[in-house]
From Swiss-Prot:
Keyword Metal-binding attached: no
Name of the protein: Large ribosomal subunit protein bL31
Role noted for this protein: Binds the 23S rRNA.
InterPro entries: Ribosomal_bL28/bL31-like_sf, Ribosomal_bL31, Ribosomal_bL31_A, Ribosomal_bL31_sf
Matches recorded under Pfam families: Ribosomal_L31
Family: Belongs to the bacterial ribosomal protein bL31 family. Type A subfamily.
Subunit note: Part of the 50S ribosomal subunit.
GO MF annotations, alphabetized: rRNA binding; structural constituent of ribosome
Record's keyword annotation contains rRNA-binding: yes
């Protein structure tokens, strides 16, 4: 293998939405990855729809497109 061309592959801790944790290996730059949605909370697996807006993205979208609509 060529040296210095591959990303750093190291152990990280993945934190699920319920607070449980597990360790895996990844090229993710941080030491810990906190999930906003996972198989325990995803609507496709639970059958329950819930709205998740962790970074204000939904509010930003609604503000940007508030006046947008089909005009008759």
């Amino acid at each position: 293998m060529k040296k210095d061309i591959h990303p750093d592959y190291h152990d990280i801790t993945v934190v699920m939405t319920d607070g449980s944790e597990f360790v895996t290996r990844s090229t993710y730059k941080g030491e810990s990855l906190r999930l906003d949605i996972d198989p325990k909370s995803h609507p496709a697996w639970t059958g329950v729809h819930r709205l998740i807006d962790s970074g204000g993205q939904l509010a930003k979208f609604n503000k940007k497109f508030a006046g947008f609509g089909l005009k008759k």
